[in-house]
């Protein structure tokens, strides 16, 4: 037995929503009188909304009650949703559509494993939704990556044993989650950060069905 399913992270793998997260978090940080850099934003990739805010407050040595934190997180989300509402298929990352088409044509199951609570909106706007046989997002999971829950739920929904799944991830926490879940991982980004993955590539243009099957 070999490859049966591919599970995709969303932000940083299929679409570049990190730039919108950055702009919205920056806007929020500025209202709190804080600065927020792209380097700090890097550390929020794959991390849930509430945890991201907690980190930003920690970096600034700020504390506030949970109620206030929830208020700020939803303020940021409002701005973020406004930004992603204008997304189109042009914002799908290089190589993604070609690979998804090839997987579909070869009856490989396709699942989403994202921490985002806005994943469905993004998939709708970019026209990616019809490719997916199962969607697992931040509304479904209770434990964040590196916990393997998001991918294990995906495999379960697809009816595939984890060992026949390959995960595509741009965040080291996501690669760790895939490995903990007994799946193979392809890292999208740099070797230094994602070295634990079986294969690391710059983007999906470097991947076709044969490359994935060769991991087995
Ligand atoms: P939301 P992924 C993650 O998406 C993003 O990388 C991360 O920056 C974001 O905080 C998280 O989703 C939650 O997003 O605020 O939309 O629920 O990489 O897991 O697809
Ligand atoms: Mg990601």
Where are these regions (language model features)?
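Asp-based, Mg2+/Mn2+-dependent phosphohydrolase catalytic module
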Residues: 1-4, 97, 101-102, 116-216
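Active-site neighborhood of HAD-like aspartate-dependent phosphohydrolases
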Residues: 1-42
């Amino acid at each position: 037995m070999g490859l049966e399913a591919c599970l995709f992270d969303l932000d940083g793998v299929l679409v570049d929503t990190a730039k919108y997260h950055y702009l919205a978090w920056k806007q929020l940080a500025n209202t709190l009188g804080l600065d927020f850099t792209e380097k700090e934003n890097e550390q929020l990739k794959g991390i849930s909304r509430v945890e991201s805010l907690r980190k930003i407050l920690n970096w600034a040595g700020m504390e506030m009650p949970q109620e206030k934190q929830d208020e700020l997180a939803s303020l940021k989300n409002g701005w973020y949703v406004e930004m992603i509402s204008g997304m189109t298929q042009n914002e799908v990352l290089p190589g993604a559509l070609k690979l998804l088409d090839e997987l579909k044509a070869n009856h490989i199951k396709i699942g989403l494993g994202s921490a985002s609570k806005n994943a469905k909106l993004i998939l709708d706007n970019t026209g990616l939704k019809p490719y997916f046989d199962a969607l697992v997002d931040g509304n479904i999971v209770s434990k964040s990556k590196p916990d393997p829950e998001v991918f294990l739920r995906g495999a379960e929904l697809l009816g595939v044993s984890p060992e026949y799944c390959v995960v595509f991830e741009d965040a080291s926490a996501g690669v760790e989650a895939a490995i903990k879940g007994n799946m193979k991982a392809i890292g999208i980004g740099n070797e230094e950060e994602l070295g634990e993955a079986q294969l690391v590539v710059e983007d999906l243009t470097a991947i076709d069905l044969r490359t994935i099957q060769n991991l087995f």
